[in-house]
Amino acid sequence: IANDGVRVSPTVIAGTSDASGNYTPSATRESVRVVSAETAQKMRLMMESVVSANGTAPTAAIAGYRVAGKTGTAMRIDDTCGCYRGYTASFIGFAPADKPAYVISVTIQDPKGLHWGGALGGPVFKKVMSFVLQSKGIAPTGTTVDPVALTEKQLIAERKLAEQKAARVKTN
């Protein structure tokens, strides 16, 4: 989604350096289009709503930057009893959302007490991504985004507004 719909096989090693300091980049990784660029752009806008004040991870927002993300909360299976016991909380996000440069994933296994991905992973993401953006000299975004409707009530209201605008255009 952050790469305009092209999935690139992940790697941990960007390249190697020999004893003389000569750098050799890793082999080119396979890339495959998995969604259209248009769909990826729409998904990025939706994912920005996740870090909005009404989203599930407002604690991941970084002042001055457009940030997008996805929260996750999953129950963990306990092999000893074959039942669910504990949680995995996660948040994965990227910034700047309008021109993605960095992606960070935070996964917390078996947290105690609070277990929601946005509440636990969001602050960690914010701290790490803020450091990355500042240390890499990424200028603040300077643009804003209209939030995507997050509830059925908001979706219905937006649909009615769009229909009213369309009706006005037809009568003009």
Residue spans for each PLM region:
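Active-site beta-strand/loop architecture of penicillin-binding DD-peptidases
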Residues: 1-31, 47-137
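A conserved catalytic-loop motif detector
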Residues: 32-39
